[in-house]
Curated annotation (Swiss-Prot):
Cofactor details (free text): Binds 1 Mg(2+) ion per subunit.
Record GO biological process: glucose metabolic process
Enzyme Commission code: 5.4.2.2
Protein name: Phosphoglucomutase
Necessary cofactors: Mg(2+)
Domain of life: Bacteria
Catalytic machinery residues: S103
Lineage: Bacteria, Pseudomonadati, Pseudomonadota, Betaproteobacteria, Neisseriales
């Protein structure tokens, strides 16, 4: 039996510490397991790419060998963003691809995001890969799979520049956080006609300037300073593998993804009245009314890019987004999340205005908290903890209790959310309300529920 660390098999991907939980052998056996799943589906060719992490080339060599030893042919597209790998998978390999990426994790992490036949592997499908490894359920190959190397950056660039059209050039600043997006973003936005100030666009897997995670305000401070001190009208930031977008206005306001989605939804609905728009359970309560007001159907879904993608397939939604910064366009695009492409679509919308920051600042806004995290005791199951809390919880004055992903409690003047993270052993909390007094009242209701479990510590 192949030996492998079980807990690297996460809800949305495979991820671990390189050399410790994610070894070269593990990469090889994961390649063999993916090949076995591919064989079940009649898939013979898989696209393979990596981000800019230092461990990428070595892991790529071993997972590629696992695939080819099992008879799968590999289209190796080298160092790319995760969405560029998806682009190659969709256009060259029937929707099958493996991306070697640690996303926004610390430098010593890496992992794999996988899609087969157009479906993102997540949840049960990832556990099936683990079962294949543990049971040696690999396929014997009649012949070794071939490897073809191809640079797809030109085709990706030309596709976007060919169909995203700005009404005027915009002066922008971009911050790639030394992630792989930096190798492609500047050229793309210049190709669309913009003037671009580049921050930390040199790919460096040590991430020497700040962590490549635009969902955290501390990682946007350099971009905010560049906007304040320079001529740029708007700022865009990307995570380590460039599948997420952060947006900052000229005056330093962070436009969180649920408010970005208002603009994207309005734009898509202008051309497609009645279209469905999907958002995750963490999003602002102002989003659904906005979508309806602009003639769309609003659908709330579980947090997690794989859940959003499958909901898009099921419902035929044309655009979707989640609070972490993943934005998915089916209209004029392929339905996968892409930070660089979402940035291009944003610039297309904003180019109709002489004052992009004003357009963004005028989007509806409530008072809200950032994500608050509560660490869980070792070995506890977050989903079970939430169920136990919910069973004895009382929320006086609540208008609706939504349980699609944890517990989202709606009040006339705000909401509170607690859910279990699918990636780390924490509970995630978020609050939003019309006034500071309302947000404090809602937080106190949740505090009483949380503190009914003596092992949980209230984070405020």
């Amino acid at each position: 039996m192949a030996s492998i660390t079980r807990d690297i098999f996460k809800a949305y991907d495979i991820r671990g510490i390189v050399g410790k939980t994610l070894t070269d052998d593990a990469a090889y056996f994961i390649g063999r397991a993916i090949a076995a799943k591919a064989a079940e589906k009649g898939i013979a060719r898989i696209a393979l790419g990596r981000d800019g992490r230092l461990s990428g080339p070595e892991l790529m060599e071993h997972i590629q060998r696992g695939l080819t030893d099992s008879g799968i042919s590999v289209l190796n597209v080298g160092m790319v963003t995760t969405p560029m790998l998806y682009f190659a998978a969709v256009n060259e390999c029937g929707g099958s691809g493996v991306m070697i990426t640690g996303s926004h994790n610390p430098p010593d992490y890496n992992g794999f995001k996988m899609m087969l036949g157009g479906d993102t592997l997540a949840g049960e499908a990832i556990q099936e890969l683990l079962a294949i490894v543990e049971k040696d359920g690999f396929v014997a190959a009649d012949k070794q799979g071939s490897v073809t190397e191809k640079d797809i950056s030109g085709a990706y660039h030309d596709h976007i520049v060919g169909h995203v059209k700005l009404k005027r050039p915009i002066n922008i600043a971009i911050d790639a956080g030394n992630g792989v997006g930096g190798a492609f973003a500047g050229k793309l936005y210049k190709g669309l006609g913009n003037e671009v100030t580049e921050l930390f666009c040199e790919v460096d897997g040590n991430f020497p300037n700040h962590h490549p995670d635009p969902s955290k305000p501390e990682n946007l401070q350099d971009l905010i300073a560049a906007l304040k001190n320079g001529d740029a009208e708007i700022g865009l930031a990307f995570d380590g593998d460039a599948d997420r977008l952060g947006v900052v206005t000229k005056d330093g306001n962070i436009i969180y993804p649920d408010r970005q989605l208002m603009l994207f939804a309005q734009d898509v609905l202008n051309r497609n009245p009645g279209a469905k728009v999907i958002f995750d359970v963490k999003s602002t309560r102002l989003l659904a009314p906005w979508i309806k007001e602009h003639g769309g159907e609003a659908i709330m879904e579980k947090t997690g890019h794989s859940f959003i993608k499958s909901a898009m397939k099921k419902t035929g939604a044309l655009v979707a987004g989640e609070m972490s910064g993943h934005v998915f366009f089916k209209e004029r695009w392929f339905g996968f999340d892409d930070g660089l492409y979402a940035g291009a679509r944003l610039l297309e919308i904003l180019s109709a205005s002489d004052n992009p920051s004003e357009v963004l600042d005028n989007l509806p806004q409530s008072i809200s908290t950032p994500e608050l995290n509560i660490s869980l005791p070792e070995g506890s199951n977050g989903h079970q903890v939430i169920e136990e809390l919910a069973a004895k919880a009382e929320f006086e004055g609540a208008t609706e209790i939504i349980t699609i992903d944890g517990l989202r409690v709606e009040f006339p003047d705000g909401f509170g959310l607690m859910r279990a993270s699918n990636t780390t052993p924490i509970l995630v909390l978020r609050f939003e309300a019309d006034t500071q007094a309302a947000i404090e009242r809602i937080q106190n209701r949740f505090k009483a529920v949380i503190e009914s479990n003596p092992h949980l510590i209230w984070p405020l």
